Every structure is written in C-alpha cells, then in structure tokens.
Amino acid sequence: METTKVVCNKEFQIDRVDSRLFGSFLEHMGRVIYSGIYEPDNKNADEDGFRQDVIDRVKEMNVTTVRYPGGNFVSAYHWEDGVGAKEKRPHKLDLAWRSIETNEFGTNEFMKWAKKTNVNPIFTVNLGTRGVEDAAHYLEYCNFSSGTQYSDMRKSHGVDEPYGIKMWCLGNEMDGSWQIGHKSAEEYGKIAAETGKVMKLIDPDIELIVCGSSLSSMDTYPEWDMEVLDKTYDVADYLALHQYYAGQEKGTKTFLAQSVDMEEYIHTIRSVAQVIKQKKRSKKDMKFSVDEWGVWAVPSNTVNNEIDEKPWQIAPAISEQIYTLEDALLFAEMQMVIIRNADAIKIACQSLLTNISACIMTEKGGGHWFCLLYTSDAADDSLRV
C-alpha cells in the first residue's frame, strides 16, 4: 500500500498571505449588480437600495477587496454616465453584453456599498474606446481634493472628501478578440504605459495593474504578457491574470486535475516577468493580480445564445449556475494554488460575487442562496509542505 508523507514546519515559509487574496469582482453583467447587490424595491433593501441580506453575506465571507465596474463592460463604459442625479443619468447600450444599462448604480453608489461591506475597491479604467485623458479625469474625480473641474464635480454630487482609491486596473482583457477596442500587445502596452504615467502624476501613491493574457489557453500567451511588461514594467505594479475552468462533463479526475494547469500557468508567467526584469536590469519584482478566477460551468456558446434570445433588456438573467460539490473542490484547489504563490500573487478576485459563477445567488424580489466557498479567515503565512 502506497503512503504519502507530508512534512509541515513553520520555517518553510513562502511569504505572508496578503489579505487582498480574498477579494471578489462586480461587473455590470446580467444580474450581478441589479437585483444582485442593488434592488431598491426588494424587501431586504436598505435606505440606499442595497440588499442588506447580501451585505451581511459579504461580511460573513470577509471579502477584503472588490474589483469594479468590469470586466468586458468597462471597455465601452463612460464613468460620467453613472454619477450625479439619478434621474438625469442616461440609459445606454451595453455593447459587451447586449443589454440596456440604466446607470442607476455607478461610482458613488459602489463606494457607498464598499464602505458598508468594509471592502477595498479596485477600479478599472476604459482603455477600449477611451484612453489617457479619460482615465486622468476619472482619477481626478475620485482622488483629488478640490479646486479642479472633476474634483469639484464630485463635491457637487455630495461627496466632499476624495475617496483615495489606491488600486487601478488599466483596461480589461485587451488581448481578447471579444473585447471592445481590442488591441495588439504593442498597442495596448503603449497606451497603458502612457495612461499609467499620467495617473501617477496625479496620485503617485496609486498601484497600477496592467492586462496580462485573458486565459493561459490564448494563442498569444505568453508573448502578449512579455511585450506588455516590456513596455509597462517601469509604471506597472501588478500584471493581471485571469483563469476560469469548466469541463465537468470530462469526468471528475480530469475536471479536478485542472488546478495543475493553473499552477503551471503561474510558474510560467513568473518566469516571463523575471526575463523582463533582467532585460531592464530592474530591482523591482513584478507582482501579480489574479483579479478574475473561478469555476464557470456555463459554456460560452450557451451564454451567447441566452443573450441572442433576449437582447437589449435591463439586467437579464444570463450565465447563472448553481455550484456542485465537484465545483467547490476545484474552487478550493485553485485557491490553494494562489496561496502557494503568495510571494508573487498579492491580489485575487473570485469572479463573480453574485449570480454568475457566484457564491451568492439572489432571487429578484425575494431572498438568496449562499454557499460559503471561501473566507479570508486564513493563516498569516503560506508554507511549503
């Protein structure tokens, strides 16, 4: 009979586990926002229209960080549409998910919700249809004190003090052909470097996250990541990694073994970053933000069919799934991979928080279902075993 020996010792320390590894993600997609966390007419809504039952669950999970507002959604998003008087906010076409965006929930609503849930925000700027100037204006609105056009705009919206948002993603999945404003690595690297440079002129204390590959299966991986890092290494603080797994129909063994692929993905991308570090003779080690990860069982063609069947609706139910025990096991394996690489990965966002590949499933006009798949109540150190 074969036996396995596991040796644990507190001296086998990899690194401290950053609390930001236990984050999540909110995108204007399907019912993630509307009836997910925000539903003024729901019996569970508080005075601001936020679902108190969901707030309680987020606190129970001890979610530390939440990324917003996307996701594919952000690549055509105008942040100005989601601030100011709600009755004056425009309804817009959401081109990413072919729905109608009411803009009833925007920057200031999210920040109010973040305060109630005790989470640190990560904001994403639009580098699909917009660029350097827009990102600078958004940062000025959020973080500059007063006396300028956009800081005074924020104050006129009832937010006197700047938010001081520290973590910013420079676009989303720009390597993907599905992305609005899709760019080559060279094109994206240039605009990300310039955007980051300008944003750090406004607020030198912010941390910037540049787009890596959308998945390890992308044809351009890891060449994309290498070229982007080559152009942004001096201004970037993190490289974003995204990874989802499905394939339950292939059987339990094959399905659960996918965490090995994730481990190899991270080891490869760490090596890529080291190559660029040596090329630039830099003293800085690039860190990583796995700001979209999870088990997503709904096939992409099914999601597309759902959208085709009900296009241009407000917050339609799309890509909703209920986790199984098998899903939870792979979910746990993926989280262990992240923790084992705690010396390099400092941010991680389980995707998504509500209703799509989520731990919290809500009923519009009703209650919710909750699966406590993870919590930030973890040990301080990551250890080799």
Language-model-detected regions and their locations in the chain:
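Active-site rim elements
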Residues: Q321-L325, I360-H368
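A structural micro-motif
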Residues: V119, I206, M286, I345-K346
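N-terminal catalytic cores of secreted or lumenal carbohydrate-active enzymes
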Residues: E2-A246, K250, H267
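Acidic carboxylate-rich catalytic motifs and surrounding loops in phosphoryl-/glycosyl-chemistry enzymes
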Residues: V125-L127, C349-N355, I360-T362
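Substrate-binding cleft of secreted/luminal carbohydrate-active enzymes
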Residues: D327, F331-I356
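Noncatalytic carbohydrate-binding groove/subsite architecture in carbohydrate-active enzymes
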Residues: A185-M334
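Conserved small/polar residues in nucleotide/adenosyl-binding loops
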Residues: Y374-D381
